[in-house]
């Protein structure tokens, strides 16, 4: 599967059996076979002013059509037992919720509570991002609960509880990356590795193949390699591709 992409004249970096491509994801999709991907993580532009990549959409409808086209391609690539995660802005979440229902079973409507950021004076502070967790088959998909359990406050008091902990809530309190944190790189919407790790651990097994069509700073790609998964990362913007490749070289040697 990955060989079909590496044979193409894309600018790309091969790392640990995975590939990170500098291209538009719609130029790469044709080289990905139907039902060949175990999980997809979509972190698309948000139709907000967060960098040059958000200025390409002429209207809200134009943006939503772009998102639906992405979902359709990812649906084609995904195995019947596969999972798809997609981030979006709060403003777009209702539209994308309805859109996803046409193609998937929505298993969870997760909230990434990220804190940080500037507190506005005329409205409540925006401190979370929606994250949809979807599956092709609600009865048959990879779900590794034991790999993501969190400690229960009652763990020491009730011996009947699972010693590995409880299932995480649907609100994930994982701090955003700000300032000079060790993993911070020059990217406006970089996701923390802790967040990416949880997504990948719960929905895939070792040696599974993950598709990341908007790979950005490379966080999901780094997590996949750390966790012994294969991945196809795609990033259109050359400046962020270069940032990610430098980061991958550091993490993956």
Q: What are the language-model segments listed below?
A:
Residues 244-245:
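Conserved SAM-binding loop
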